[in-house]
Structure formats: C-alpha cells, structure tokens
C-alpha cells in the first residue's frame, strides 16, 4: 500500500503536465519566421537569392576615344581613331580637307583626363606678361616661353640629361657646309604644316629670316643676332629674289645661305627664337603699308600669335594682356604622339 501511494504522489496525472510546445518556423532569416514558436516544425521557407548584378560593359582603356570610366568589363569596343600618320597622309593627298583633318586629329591626339593626378588642363603663374608673340621682335623670357610653344626653328637648344645644353634638329633634317665655310645648305622636313593647314617650305624659312632684317626689330633690337651673319634684299615678299645673293631656294625642302664670314656659331644663332619660321603668305597678306614708310612687316598681326602663323605644338586661343594667355593644341603639329595638355593657361 505504501508503494502505491508513493507512486501516485510522484507521477501525477497526464492532465496535469506543463505547457505544450508552440510549433512553427524558428529561424529568423526565413520568410515565415514565427517569433512565438518554441519548436521548429520544419516548415521554414526562404526567399530566392538576389541575382548578381550584371557588370557594366564598355571600353576600359583610358587611352581610347570612347573610354567609359564606369565600365567594369571590357567589351572590345575601344576606338582609338585613325593614326596621326594616316590622317596627315590623306590631308597631303587632298582626300580630306583641313576641317576634317583637324577634327580627326583632335579625336586621335587629344589628352584624356584620368583623374586628378593626370589633368589635361594646367594653370601656370607667369613671371610676367609677354611683351609680344612676334618671334622676330622678342627678347624677354616671358615672350620667349610662349613663342617656343607656338613657333619652331630649324634647330633648338635642349638638355642632354646631364645638365649640359645641346642643339637638336627640329624643322631641318640636316645641313652641309661648303669648303670655304661660307655657304650652309639645309634640308627640311617635308611633313610640316602651319596651324591653319598651309604647308611649310623653304621659301617660308628664307622669308622669315629676311623679315628679321627688313623689319629691324625696333622694340627689342634682337635682329642683330642674324644681321651679323648675312643680308637680304628688302624682305618685300618676293620669294624669288628677296634673299638676294645670300640665299638660294633650291627646292621646297632645301635652301642655302651664304654668310659674310665663316662662323662656327651660326647654327647656335638660328636656334634662338629670332630664327623662328613663320607663314610667309599670311604675313604678306597682313602687312600694313607694305613697302611704304610705315611698313610694319605684319608685326601688328604677328604681335598676338595668330592662327596659322606657326608650326609648333600650340596656338594662342586667347590673350588678355596683363591678365591671362591661353594656349590650345595645334592639331596639325608634325611630331607624332598624343597631347598630355589640352589647355595651358598662363596668368
């Protein structure tokens, strides 16, 4: 009897048990999660995973014309335009005009900015404003800094990498000297164009050097650099006789000049900016009182570095004196390669 009584006290009845489990989905990341469930019943369902976003397709090469900075995967669509050489060959052949050539060259050669560490535009604080952009009457450094970017010479000064200066060829491809040391015969590049598309030839060089003597550089007197070496007739624009006995135009790419006396420094003198080559036809077209007492030898026109006057890498877009000067590329520039600066402001 004792055993039966103890059993009844310890076991209790079935109706007297604890709370029943609440069945349901107990996983919080399930779409049917039940926060009240105390026991998982295997019914959890889950949302379909979000699909991976499609990568942005496009040209990923910063050097291409159609570079897409947002592109993640290259789609082989990169366009580099036609080469400088091919465009200029078509221009020389007359297949395309100046407008088309300029457009294609800009597309092909322009700087493409790749973030703040590779800007295509720079602003430079100058030591002072240029006095003129006429290379045949400029002697100051501020003018020279601009002139060297707009006009070119047969030879120029350059560094040799060790701190010494050397002279390297630019518009000339070479020269020879007669046995008596008096006559220099130059050969010129045949692929040089002024910024307006006119082709440069030997008569432009003769005209330019004789203009220095004819105009006389009244403000700077820089003309003495050439005056000591040779003379001309009167730089009146007659390409057949303007050089007088000193000059001979042999062909479009060759001419000779005879000096007063042998000079080992002659190449050095013509490497200075006073030896720059200008567009003879445009200068003649813009002379004031040509042949008269007030002949300006196109100085008023040349003073601000007009379009078409030079053959170097840049042209003057804007010049507000004592404020700013803006240089932009001469897309017709003869050296191959792309530009790393599309706009150079000097202020």
Regions found by a protein language model. Name each.
Residues 119-129, 183-185, 205-208, 255-257, ...:
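Short, well-ordered beta-strand elements
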Residues 125-179, 309-310:
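N-terminal lobe/hinge region of extracytoplasmic solute-binding protein
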């Amino acid at each position: 009897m004792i055993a039966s009584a103890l059993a009844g006290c310890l076991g209790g009845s079935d109706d007297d048990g604890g709370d029943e489990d609440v069945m349901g989905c107990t996983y919080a990341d399930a779409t049917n999660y039940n926060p009240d469930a105390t026991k998982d019943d295997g019914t959890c369902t889950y949302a379909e995973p979000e699909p991976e976003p499609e990568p942005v397709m496009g040209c990923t090469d910063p050097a291409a014309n159609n570079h897409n900075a947002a592109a993640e995967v290259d789609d082989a669509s990169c366009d580099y335009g036609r080469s400088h050489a091919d465009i200029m060959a078509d221009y020389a052949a007359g297949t395309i005009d100046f407008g088309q050539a300029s457009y294609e060259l800009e597309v092909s050669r322009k700087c493409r900015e790749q973030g703040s560490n590779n800007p295509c535009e720079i602003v430079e604080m100058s030591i002072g404003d240029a006095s003129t952009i006429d290379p045949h009457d400029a002697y100051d450094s501020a003018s020279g800094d601009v002139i060297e970017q707009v006009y070119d010479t047969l030879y120029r000064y350059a560094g040799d990498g060790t701190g010494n200066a050397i002279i390297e060829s630019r518009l000339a491809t070479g020269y020879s000297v007669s046995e008596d040391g008096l006559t220099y015969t130059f050969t010129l590049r045949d692929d040089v164009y002024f910024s307006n598309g006119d082709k440069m030839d030997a008569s432009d060089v003769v005209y330019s050097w004789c203009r220095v003597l004819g105009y006389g550089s009244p403000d700077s007197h820089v003309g003495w650099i050439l005056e000591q070496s040779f003379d001309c007739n009167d730089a009146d624009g007659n390409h057949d006789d303007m050089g007088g006995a000193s000059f001979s135009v042999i062909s479009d790419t060759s001419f000779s000049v005879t000096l007063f006396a042998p000079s080992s420094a002659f190449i050095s003198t013509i490497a200075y900016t006073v030896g720059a080559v200008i567009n003879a036809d445009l200068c003649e077209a813009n002379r004031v009182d040509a042949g008269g007492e007030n002949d300006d030898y196109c100085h008023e026109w040349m003073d601000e570095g007009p379009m078409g006057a030079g053959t170097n890498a840049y042209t003057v877009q804007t010049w507000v004196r004592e404020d700013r000067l803006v240089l932009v590329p001469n897309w017709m520039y003869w050296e191959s390669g792309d530009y790393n600066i599309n706009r150079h402001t000097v202020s």
